[in-house]
């Protein structure tokens, strides 16, 4: 992934390597809001062969709850950049939403997706770095909740750091 300045729009591209040179740039996905912080930017092929991409909220927390925005999400696309028919939102690369700044993810031995996320360290005394079990179409709550909540619209983290930060 990389960002194009001055627009701060992130994108994921594929290149062909020939004689130690990059050529044949192919954009898999673009128009991902970016900023100086909270860019996410992890990419990983899942056990289903799909490409997963974490995006931060681009220091605009409300984008995490906007299903039309690609910020504050985990995205899922085919290796050619098209959107899988099985994605939870029709014609959308959004796989899960309500993320602040997911820093990494992987799948356990049972093919369950697990993601780490930076909490809002220093902001109003909240920290709550999180470990989340990612499920398709689910809302992980940022910025409406931090840590655990009784609000059934949101998925609670599997684990969070409380009022301290791990990272």
Specify the residue positions occupied by each region the protein language model found.
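Beta-propeller domain segments
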Residues: 57-167
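Acidic, Gly/Ser/Thr-rich repeat motifs that build Ca2+-stabilized beta-propeller blades
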Residues: 1-62, 104-120, 163-167
């Amino acid at each position: 992934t990389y960002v194009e300045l001055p627009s701060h729009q992130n994108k994921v591209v594929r290149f062909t390597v020939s004689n130690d040179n990059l050529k044949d740039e192919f954009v898999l996905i673009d128009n991902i809001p970016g900023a100086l912080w909270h860019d996410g930017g992890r990419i990983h092929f899942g056990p289903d062969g799909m490409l997963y991409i974490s995006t931060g909220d681009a220091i605009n927390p409300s984008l995490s709850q906007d299903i039309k925005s690609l910020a504050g999400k985990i995205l899922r696309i085919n290796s050619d950049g098209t959107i899988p028919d099985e994605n939870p939102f029709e014609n959308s690369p959004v796989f899960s939403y309500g993320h602040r700044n997911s820093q990494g993810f992987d799948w356990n031995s049972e093919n369950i997706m697990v993601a780490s996320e930076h909490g809002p360290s220093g902001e109003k005394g909240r920290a709550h770095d999180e470990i989340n079990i990612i499920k398709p179409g689910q809302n992980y709550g940022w910025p409406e909740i931090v840590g655990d909540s009784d609000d059934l619209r949101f998925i609670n983290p599997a684990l969070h750091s409380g009022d301290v930060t791990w990272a």
